[in-house]
Swiss-Prot record:
ATP binds at residues 30-37, 149-152, 178, 186-189. The active site is at 37 (proton donor). GO terms for biological process: pantothenate biosynthetic process. This is Pantothenate synthetase. Pfam families: Pantoate_ligase. (R)-pantoate binds at residues 61, 155. The keyword Nucleotide-binding applies.
Length: 286
C-alpha cells in the first residue's frame, strides 16, 4: 500500500490507474478504525480494481473545538489495518492540504431539508462539514464508487442527495452496520465508554429492536412507540436526544401507505454520544 499526503501525490498515484481504465473505489474515514471500516474496504475491494482510503479528521464537522482536539489520531495502526485489508492507496492529508485557504474561508456544500433535522438539529453545521469534505474528496479522487456505512444513515442519504444534485457521477454504495456481540453499533466513539457505561450502551439498540418488534406485531401509534423507546433508554441510564420513525427513502415522516421505514436514535451514555438506526419493513396491511 502506498501512502500519500498531498493532492499532487494523490493525483500522480491515481493517473496511471485511470489511463489503464481501472475502476477506483473510495472509502473515506476519519481514522481510529474498527471492524466496521474494514467491512467498507472489503466491499470496495469487491467493487473495483483499486481501493483508495482516506484518513482526515475533518474540522468542519465538529461542533466543539474540544471534541476535535480529543478525537483519537492513530495513523500508524490505521495504515497497517488498511494495508492488511487490501487498500492500494492511503491519502492522509493535513488540514492545510484540504483547506488551503483555511477552514473559515472554504466554500461550503449544504443539503437543505435533509440536513436540518434529527442529527442536523442537534449538531448545527455538522452535515455542511460532512458534505463539504466528501464533495472535495470526490473531486480529488474522482472515484467510480464510494462506500459508506449505514450506521450514519442520515449522513448516507445526504451524501447520495449531494452526489445526485451536483452530478458528481459517483456510485454511492452502503454496507450494513457492524455490531459488537451485544448489539452495540461499532463506532470510533465507543472508546470513550468506561466499563459501566459500556455495559449500559447496548440498551440503545435493544430499545430500537423492541420498537421494531412492536411494529412487526401490528402496532401503529408511532408517537407512543417512540416515547416508549425513549423511556426504555432512560431506564437503562442513558440520556436520549431523539427516537424517530421515518420513511427510509428520504427520512420524511411515514404516511399510511409507507412500509419501508427506519428507526433513528441518539443518546448520551456517559461521555459518549451514541447514534444507531434500525430498518423496519412493515407487513402488508390486511
Amino acid at each position: 500500500m502506498q501512502t500519500v499526503h498531498t493532492r499532487a501525490a494523490l493525483a500522480a498515484a491515481l493517473d496511471p490507474w485511470r489511463r489503464a481504465g481501472e475502476r477506483i473505489a473510495l472509502v473515506p474515514t476519519m481514522g481510529n478504525l474498527h471492524a466496521g471500516h474494514l467491512a467498507l474496504v472489503r466491499r470496495a475491494r469487491a467493487e473495483a480494481d483499486r481501493v483508495v482510503a482516506t484518513i482526515f479528521v475533518n474540522p468542519l464537522q465538529f461542533d466543539r473545538p474540544e471534541d476535535l482536539a480529543a478525537y483519537p489520531r492513530t495513523l500508524e495502526a490505521d495504515a497497517a489495518a488498511l494495508a492488511g485489508a487490501g487498500v492500494d492507496l492511503l491519502f492522509a492529508p493535513a488540514e492545510q492540504e484540504v483547506y488551503p485557504r483555511g477552514r473559515d474561508g472554504v466554500t461550503r456544500v449544504e443539503v437543505p431539508g435533509l440536513g436540518d433535522e434529527l442529527e442536523g438539529a442537534h449538531r448545527p453545521g455538522h452535515f455542511i462539514g460532512v458534505a463539504t469534505v466528501v464533495c472535495k474528496l470526490f473531486a480529488m479522487t474522482r472515484p467510480d464508487v464510494a462506500v459508506f456505512g449505514e450506521k450514519d444513515f442520515q449522513q448516507l442519504l445526504i451524501i447520495r442527495t449531494m452526489n445526485a444534485d451536483l452530478d458528481l457521477g459517483v456510485r454511492v454504495l452502503s454496507e450494513p452496520t457492524v455490531r459488537e456481540p451485544d448489539g452495540l453499533a461499532m463506532s470510533s466513539r465507543n472508546g470513550y465508554l468506561g466499563p459501566e457505561d459500556r455495559a449500559r450502551a447496548p440498551a440503545l439498540h435493544a430499545a430500537l429492536r423492541a420498537l421494531a418488534g412492536a411494529l412487526e406485531r401490528g402496532e401503529r401509534d408511532f408517537p407512543a412507540l417512540e416515547q416508549a423507546a425513549r423511556s426504555q433508554i432512560e431506564a437503562a441510564g442513558l440520556r436520549p436526544e431523539y427516537v424517530s420513525l421515518r420513511r427510509r427513502q428520504d427520512l420524511d415522516l411515514p404516511g399510511p401507505g409507507d412500509r419501508e421505514l427506519v428507526i433513528l436514535a441518539a443518546a448520551w451514555c456517559g461521555p459518549a454520544r451514541l447514534i444507531d438506526n434500525l430498518p423496519v419493513d412493515l407487513p402488508p396491511s390486511g
